[in-house]
Structures are given as C-alpha cells and as structure tokens.
Amino acid sequence: MSFSCPLCHQPLSREKNSYICPQRHQFDMAKEGYVNLLPVQHKRSRDPGDSAEMMQARRAFLDAGHYQPLRDAIVAQLRERLDDKATAVLDIGCGEGYYTHAFADALPEITTFGLDVSKVAIKAAAKRYPQVTFCVASSHRLPFSDTSMDAIIRIYAPCKAEELARVVKPGGWVITATPGPRHLMELKGLIYNEVHLHAPHAEQLEGFTLQQSAELCYPMRLRGDEAVALLQMTPFAWRAKPEVWQTLAAKEVFDCQTDFNIHLWQRSY
C-alpha cells in the first residue's frame, strides 16, 4: 500500500521520484527520501510543528536512552498483537523517528510509516532511518486509504478519532502513550509554585474497544544538560523562568520520575 492524495483522497502511485494521483496531483520526494503531503492550505503556520532547536534537544535526550523502556514496551505490544498477515503500521507525530525506526527494525516484514507535521523533524528522520517511509502531513487528515493500517501508534500525538477509525483495519490496533499523574513531577516543581498531579484525560475512541491499560513508571538520573533538553521537550518549557534553565544546566545530577499510561484499543469488526 502507499499514500493517498491529500487534495482529492485518491490513491497515489509512485512514479520515479514522485507520487501522482489519477487527478495528476503530484508530490515530489525530497532528496532525503520523504514526501511532503501537507498542502499549504492545510498549514496553520508557515513552518508548523517543532523547531530545529526543539527537535535537536529531543534527539539528544532520546538518544541517551532515557525513554527506551517506553519504546521497548510498545515494541513488545506490536510483536504480540500483529500476526503474519499484517502489512503496515503508522507512527503519528513521529518526530525525528526515535520510536519509529525501532518499530521498523522489530517488524521487518511490515511497512512502517512515520508522519509528522514538522518538516524539520521528518527531514532529519528520513536521512537517518531509510528503513521507514516518512511523510510530512497533518495528523487530522491522514494521507492513507481506508482500512489500510494494521496498527497506529500515538505517543503524545493528537489525532481525530474518526480518522483513526477510517484508516485502521477491522480488528487492528491503536496504541497510545500519554503522561500519567506523576510524570516529571520534579521538573514541574522547579517551575510552578504549586505542583498538581496530572489528571489523565479519559479518552474514548469511537469504533474501538479498550482492551488493555498499563502503567510504566521508573526513575531517571540526568545530567544538567540532559535535564535542560528534557525541559525543552515539554509543553511547560515556555513557563520556565531564566533561573530555572540556569539551575538545571548547573546541576551535576537531576533525579526525575517518569509515569506513562499505555492504552491498547482494538478496532471493531
């Protein structure tokens, strides 16, 4: 399978270094190997998604292995849930591909797609991980045919439930990872006067049945520069005063707790 046209939703066919639909809408592949399927009219800003600075901080932090237990847990679920008839999986909001390439390596017989709205992140991902098929696209308008995916992975990424239901095959899976109540409490303690437990959103995915929920919690011991990179990755970075950044950078060791919720949803038959 391949992509569908983001303009007319018909299948895209690969012709040399381009994807072309029956209406002759054409999308050229970049030299790094990805394709941009985000039409200008679907952009909310000139350069949507993470900046180069945010992407580089996330890559440095993830490459150090601090979130590898989360990655390993999702890989284990994919191996357990997908049978030998599976053909395609999609990582939504894949960023620079840290999780995505592990899915591809664990499932070599399956085509692994990575999607993100950030061109900067996808360019870096495609250059580093040629075993994955990457695209720049909106998670709210997935450029894939109906019932084309055996599994979709969403790690912190938004996506309309109706799009998930449209793209996932009957009996297929959506795996989500979201922050649990105590996720990064120590980091929040440097920023906020009062730190409250994160209230997990009780998500409902129409057309899916929640088959399993699991918690993954473990401590991290970070260097100062790693703690700074972690803060840059978070949605509360913009609330951090200059002295918070300076305090973190000066630390030899910063201990912090992770708390992830992993949910497995199965598409109704």
From Swiss-Prot:
Biological process according to GO: rRNA base methylation
Residues in the signal sequence: none
EC number: 2.1.1.187
Keyword field: Metal-binding, Methyltransferase, rRNA processing, S-adenosyl-L-methionine, Transferase, Zinc
Keyword rRNA processing: yes
Binding-site residues for S-adenosyl-L-methionine, renumbered to this chain: Y67, E96, G97, H183
Reactions that this protein is recorded to catalyse: guanosine(745) in 23S rRNA + S-adenosyl-L-methionine = N(1)-methylguanosine(745) in 23S rRNA + S-adenosyl-L-homocysteine + H(+)
Translocase listed as a keyword: no
Positions annotated to bind Zn(2+): C5, C8, C21, H25
Subunit structure: Homodimer.
PANTHER family tied to this protein: METHYLTRANSFERASE (PTHR43460), METHYLTRANSFERASE TYPE 11 DOMAIN-CONTAINING PROTEIN (PTHR43460:SF1)
Family, as annotated: Belongs to the methyltransferase superfamily. RlmA family.
Protein name: 23S rRNA (guanine(745)-N(1))-methyltransferase
Species in which this protein is naturally found: Escherichia coli (strain K12)
Gene designation: rlmA
